């Protein structure tokens, strides 16, 4: 309708005016800029779509999709992560759309992604897992077991990793002997998706892993 069209045109005009005003108002006020980015990320982490929209609205005024994209993608994978991987992928897609259309229309796909992240369950299990592995490496860097190496030396055929026995792969020990029992990944039970991952993880932990590849390779095919 004509009325709806007029409303839409006014919305576009308002967004353009906000961008124009902002380029002067916030010109290179770096402290305010990074404080606003921080407010956005903390609002997403704290599941507050209203706070997130407020800080996003302020950031629109900088007309800087790239910096905004970096911060929101970090937030998606750092704070939502395995609790809702699809939301992370939708965030990537939203910013692809945003770059295609540019501001002021870019505000719509980005707002959708931010609200999605705000109201998603949260999990920092991936970040915690890689940080635990990095901490272990800082203490001692260990080589991969011989049977995992690209060209294993001094192993009989039956002692080598068997590419033709996929049913055995989850029984193999992949960590070096010195840290064989380390568990870097600890599931967060905040979503059905990660609960399903955790259930499979428990099943694998229950049957354990072995570095005796020769014995494993001699087990009968199921």
What do these predicted ranges mean?
Residues 79-222:
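Alpha-helical, coiled-coil/dimerization segments enriched in small aliphatic residues
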Residues 15-23:
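Extended hydrophobic
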Residues 22-58:
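Conserved helicase/translocase motor-coupling segment
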Residues 44-51, 60-63, 102-105, 189:
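Short helix-adjacent coil turns
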Residues 58-74, 81-82:
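Short, charge-rich amphipathic alpha-helical segments embedded
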